[in-house]
């Protein structure tokens, strides 16, 4: 494997080949660390976080035995972005009105008035 940390960075997902120790990332090719919505664009309930983590585990398992590459990490990150979009469109996830920049990066909120 490599001596440097591989990473995938999307708008709402960051994945690292590292583990957290004392709030620092330590390179570890045997672990993947998921940083979910680092900008706090959404309001997260534990059930929804659980769904994203479950999907993350499924995706990681699907790549078992394959090379851990930048491409595969980006593919996992992109698939997780799709999961977040689905949760938002289903109304299970909501935008955070108190986030730093409210830009509706996944589309305008879906309300009964707009449907």
Swiss-Prot record:
Compartments in which it is found: Cellular thylakoid membrane
UniProt EC number: 7.1.1.-
Statement: the UniProt record of this protein carries the keyword Electron transport: no
Family classification: Belongs to the complex I NdhM subunit family.
HAMAP family in alphabetical order: NDH1_NDH1M (MF_01352)
Function: NDH-1 shuttles electrons from an unknown electron donor, via FMN and iron-sulfur (Fe-S) centers, to quinones in the respiratory and/or the photosynthetic chain. The immediate electron acceptor for the enzyme in this species is believed to be plastoquinone. Couples the redox reaction to proton translocation, and thus conserves the redox energy in a proton gradient. Cyanobacterial NDH-1 also plays a role in inorganic carbon-concentration.
Protein name, per record: NAD(P)H-quinone oxidoreductase subunit M
Species: Prochlorococcus marinus (strain MIT 9211)
